[in-house]
Amino acid sequence: VERLVEKGGPSRYVSNYAVAGVSAFSTRLLDLLEKYGTMEQTIEKMIEEKMTVTAVVWEKEWAEFTWPWDILKANRLVVDNLLKGKGSFIAESADVHNSAVLEGPVYIGKDVVVRPGATLRGPVYIGNNVYVGNNALIRDYASLCDGVHIGYAVEVRNSMIFDKVNVGRMTYIADSIVGANSCIEAGAQMWNWRPGKKPLFIDDDGEKVQIPFRKFGAMIGDNVVLGVNSSIYPARRIGEGSSIAPGCVIDQDIPPYSEVSVKQVLEIRPISEETDQCE
């Protein structure tokens, strides 16, 4: 290795190779790292001091994690490698009702329960100890990690739902990421596109970054409570530990450990006792 260059746009393209993140160095690295602060600067200094720095070429597929949507790209890579050309896998301990519909390749882990009327339209990954309720639709690269609970008539599409998430009935999750131990209550909706095919952006320290997909939903951290009938605009982030009250419409990013509610004013007017309310 002659030098390292921080990645940038096409104008800074200098090599066909990228650092994939796995390294092995002598303990000398620790002394230099304490002095120079970053791994990149430290390796550059080792090269300047004529220390031997070599690279091993990884010739298989790999996934880079820079932006939240990279999780969905990596999920597709993993699911494809797990299922494509191999057919479906269903663990012996899984309880899949005979009226459930399985289409395309699906992976179903240990002690999974799939209730009557549910549809799994692959490619789909279902981890261990997952419950999929009646009439749920899990499709198109949806991945449910261990211990996830999916309620009645929930739809999940192209999303990554991490361990022990509880999703209430009639919720819609598409092109989204839901962190572990979160509770998505009944009727929550995660919008994933803007009308007119308008591009989607996220804010990165004050700079707008365009998302490279027309559809992208919510990014929800660990231990979040998303209240009944709440809705999230496309490409919005909810930080870990936050609590969203029922009925909120989330049109901006929510910082970690925030409590969000909506102000409501009830108007109560008298009506005649003779009024037939069902007419």
Labelled PLM ranges:
Residues 91-94, 109, 127, 179, ...:
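Periodic glycine anchor positions in long extracellular repeat architectures
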